[in-house]
Amino acid sequence: MSFTYEYPRPALTVDCVVFGFDGGGLQVLLIRRALEPFLGSWALPGGFVDMDEDLDQAARRELEEETHLSRVFLEQLFTFGTPGRDPRGRV
């Protein structure tokens, strides 16, 4: 008996919000998007979750790939899932 079936499979993504202090003010780390969609726009570091990793691993990998930051305290704060958030498809 087969347990596979055709069903839409949304992509899973993570974004990281990194706070810092500069002088007396709170700062948020942003990157410039290197690819479409929104090439050159400011964005939070993040990306797609690989099939063999959990969300924490994906967040750490994406943060290091895009900012070269490692050994950073991470905590999941919110989850968003509104359809239409990304022009590439359902995330």
Model-flagged regions — what are they?
Residues 2-43, 71:
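N-terminal strand-loop-strand
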Residues 44-52:
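Short histidine-centered catalytic/ligand-binding loop motif
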Residues 1-2, 79:
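Short Pro/Gly-enriched beta-strand edge/turn motifs at strand-loop
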Residues 34-37, 49, 79-82:
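Short active-site-proximal "capping" loops at secondary-structure junctions
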Residues 10-14, 57-60, 64-91:
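Active-site segment of metal-dependent pyrophosphate-handling enzymes
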